[in-house]
Amino acid sequence: MYIAGVMSGTSLDGIDVALVRIEGSGVESKVELIHFTTVPFCNDIKSEIQQALSIENSNVQLICSLNFKLGLCFANAVKEVCKEANFSLEQLDLIGSHGQTIYHQPKQDGNRIPSTLQIGEPAVIAYETNTTVISNFRTMDMAAGGQGAPLVPYSEVILYRDPSKNRLLQNIGGISNVTVIPTQQSDQNVIAFDTGPGNMIIDEVCQRLFQLPYDQNGEIAKKGVVVDEILTYCMSHPFLKMNPPKSTGREQFGEEFVSELLKRFKKHSKENILTTVTMFTASSIVHHYKKFILPYYEIDEVILGGGGSYNSTLVEMLRNGLKDENCTIFIQEDIGYSSEAKEAIAFAILANETHHRNPSNVPSATGAKQSVVLGNVTFPPI
């Protein structure tokens, strides 16, 4: 089957689309990446997403309209990846669309029950591409008592399991998440959870203090020094004390967190603040390894993916934090994969599993009561 996996993450970099060929289903699936592209959001759409994400500035009228606008954006991104690959849209069998997360409530909070909302209307995508769309992957896991995240572990088992090596798959997107893939294990024995912020705080600080969308290659952070009082404040966040399975998002590490941090520590230089929040991402990852993983597994390899794997300062901080653990750190490209395409490929794989009516959540990672078939299916008009 030819499947387009579509992902728009918490970093708001744009729409990632992976055109993938998949043979079979389940853990024996054969997956081939044909082409990958990222279609940037235009400034107006990005601004509307940011407004929709803000509890203070969002409104139902905006979200209703944006749902359809993003559906059209996602459809156009699928057309673009096919065009770049010289691949006929008519040959496409399926689209797996994650959507844009607007709010994610993994646990009960007062009268707010666990819930999640991703937008990017699948009917618009199906109509514009004349292709079946599978979307809303997180909701069935949450209906089964899970947190709806992380969902990539199933695909990581398919792509990265090794009979002789214990591997950690560390994704550093807006949020960071880790998957433990032991030797000779089935997906139900996989451990996976969010480790905290990835690029989210780094990017927000960059935008506010340097008027830059992100710290390219970690060049600015390389110039500063870590401020202990800021790092101590960050590392005291309640999320770091929670036991897995757990997930987090912009609600905990977004604009409000950064506003409070900059207000508290405004006396420090811009460079030192950026260096310290970069260290916070690295330290939160290392903290979770040492508390929840390394006491139980001897890890042979750590494989980094996501946009954060291109931040050499962050990667060096991780290497230093793990220097005594006798494990080798790679990035996706070192082993023949793409850091950028990883999550889009994951949702192509999940769409394939849903098409075959196979469960593809990992209850040991999400906390769900059982394995479930993920996603809603939207058929094309004809």
Curated annotation (Swiss-Prot):
CDD domains: ASKHA_NBD_ANMK (cd24050). It catalyses: 1,6-anhydro-N-acetyl-beta-muramate + ATP + H2O = N-acetyl-D-muramate 6-phosphate + ADP + H(+). NCBIfam families: PRK09585.2-1, PRK09585.3-2. This is Anhydro-N-acetylmuramic acid kinase. Pfam families: AnmK. The keyword Kinase applies. Belongs to the anhydro-N-acetylmuramic acid kinase family.
